[in-house]
Amino acid sequence: MKTRTLVAVLAIFAMVSGACGGDDETDAGTTPATTAAPAETSAAPAADESAGGSAMSGLDIDAVLAADLDACVDAPSGDPIRVGMAMDFSDVVGFVDIPGSKLVPYVAALINCAGGIDGRPVEVRVAEVGDDAALATQELLDWGAQFLIGPPFADFALPILQTTGGGVPLFVAASTEPTLADMSINSYLVTFDDHGMAGAAAKWALDEGITRAIVFTEGEGIPYTGVNPDAFAAAFVAGGGEVVSTQTYVWAADTDFSAQVNEIAGISENNEVVFSAALAFQVTALRGQLEGQGLDGLTYIGTDALDATGISVEANNEGIAHTPHTSISAGDPIDTLLAGYEAANGEALESRGFMALYVDSMFLGIQGILDCGCDDPAGIGEAVQQISGFSGLSGEITYAGTNGIPPKAVPINRIVDGADVLVATIGG
């Protein structure tokens, strides 16, 4: 499949200029379109279309979130800050990369509406990796991207890193794969990794007084679908628990668990915790089949995949726990940002708990530029490696003293009376 590219700056320009009095309108909320070698476009409104006022200094996240696209300050006119997004729109991770690639240009529009970064406009270009992540990456580098936001899985992230030669910062926004964090090649997670996530799930189960576990895996050591169960089992046993059954399945595909259920029914005491990295529809299907065998006392906890695939709206979801990247409450900064996007674009973004990671990826790259006072990717990367205590939308982020995995607390959410609520926070 040919690599498809999008100049998200076009959407930003249309969004902001339309809000500030321009005549042309572009629907920036649609799935990115296919274009070839797009032209560069400023991401800021023209100066004579602004409402005037003073621009923000540096990166002021509060000012960005408060920006009103109907009342922008004077347009930034300095050299642009260029953000490249190499995104995977496939069925495997498109449910996070697609909405993420829509939100980041919108936030860039808010930055520019607030006057830019010390008078510099922020431009965003999105390239779909398709079947050639290297080509998509090269297009972004040729455009002048100073840092990149990448897809969550190694099969596309590694070709991106091979193309950059480790010389350009890459924030793998939605990834929890520990192998993708390596500051020596400028590769950074923006959240906790699989070990932190699964370990927190195990601790929560133990704290609930559960001492027996049933684990579903795709196989030992398999990225994400095997590593998370491995990490859960290790932490659960280390904490005094026992894994009484380990079952295999096909991630994102299986919904008939009759063989596994029959085996579990023979050993279960109906008081175990069931852990997997399965998708929401798989967990609820498994639960229904286990309940059909009379096993209605089990506790279910899963990974960030449950948040990404809509556990909060699945049938038979009551009591299911999961580990989202952010626990969003009404009126908080993330909720306000997503509501603003929806109002501006007429579309509610999916995978809400992941969206702050994409925005923080852009913020972190910009902070690196501010800290180094430079535009070259190598210098930006050196500055990113020294970031400590950065207050992002998704929480506090520190890279100094790490290998690119920020030490972050893991929220535990649970469906309680039909609502997805925070019930614990582990670590941090």
Q: What label would you give each PLM region?
A:
Residues 24, 68, 95-102, 114-180, ...:
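Beta-alpha junction/loop-to-helix N-cap segments that form part of ligand/metal-binding clefts
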Residues 187, 289-359, 370, 416, ...:
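Extracellular/periplasmic periplasmic-binding protein-like sensory domains
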Residues 344-355, 366-419:
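Segments of small-molecule ligand-sensing domains
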Residues 89, 187-252:
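An alpha-beta-alpha
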Residues 53-105, 127-131, 220-226, 350-356:
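Extracytoplasmic "Venus flytrap"
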Residues 19-30:
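Bacterial lipoprotein signal-peptidase II cleavage site
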Residues 47, 51-70, 388-428:
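Solvent-exposed, acidic/polar segments of extracytosolic/periplasmic ligand-binding ectodomains
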Residues 162-166, 228-325:
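Extracellular/periplasmic bilobed ligand-binding domains
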